[in-house]
Swiss-Prot record:
It comes from the Eukaryota. Acts as a transcriptional transactivator of TCEA1 elongation activity. Acts as a transcriptional transactivator of ELL and ELL2 elongation activities. Potent inducer of apoptosis in prostatic and non-prostatic cell lines. Inhibits prostate tumor growth in vivo. Isoform 1 and isoform 2 interact with TCEA1. Component of the super elongation complex (SEC), at least composed of EAF1, EAF2, CDK9, MLLT3/AF9, AFF (AFF1 or AFF4), the P-TEFb complex and ELL (ELL, ELL2 or ELL3). Interacts with ELL and ELL2. This is ELL-associated factor 2. Residues 116-126, 225-234 have a biased composition (Basic and acidic residues). It comes from Homo sapiens (Human).
Amino acid sequence: MNSAAGFSHLDRRERVLKLGESFEKQPRCAFHTVRYDFKPASIDTSSEGYLEVGEGEQVTITLPNIEGSTPPVTVFKGSKKPYLKECILIINHDTGECRLEKLSSNITVKKTRVEGSSKIQYRKEQQQQQMWNSARTPNLVKHSPSEDKMSPASPIDDIERELKAEASLMDQMSSCDSSSDSKSSSSSSSEDSSSDSEDEDCKSSTSDTGNCVSGHPTMTQYRIPDIDASHNRFRDNSGLLMNTLRNDLQLSESGSDSDD
């Protein structure tokens, strides 16, 4: 132990320092130091790891993570360099033994990310998905303006057709009004004619007005009162004429009787 805290547990009495097996001519063991650039808290310190030395002094260290972590292991890769004069002091606090061992090599490793399992890779995939979705969105928007331009055409055509139909209907209604007014004036001017001709004129005007009304159902509710009023005038005028004729006949008969 090479820290100050380790020496604090030692008392002031003298101890025997032994040289370890690494100092033998044919050492049966070797000691190495490992330096990590970053050691995650998810590593399970109670489990054993694996160290593999490959070609070119390349070193791979695999340490298990806590159960349920993603990924299940953490992998470190690096290289080793030999030590020349460095040693390590090992103190056994239970027995009080102090042993000096020779360091063989210094291993420096860096944490690697497992492809497809790390959080960074997951975030990259999410970003790629968002970029792909954003790239698709403009293509969909480009087609919408043309459809929006074409869609308002049909309501405008419908409005134009409705306006034309209303204008045509107004023309027909005005023509019917003028014809009915002319017939009403002609019927009122013929009060001095005979009752038969008045009845025929009344029938013809009634039939013509009926045709006009039947041809334009929308106008019926507006023109029926005028037709009824003119028909009533025809009846009043006809009755007045008949009374006048009867009075004339009675006067002529009374005059002839007086002459006799």
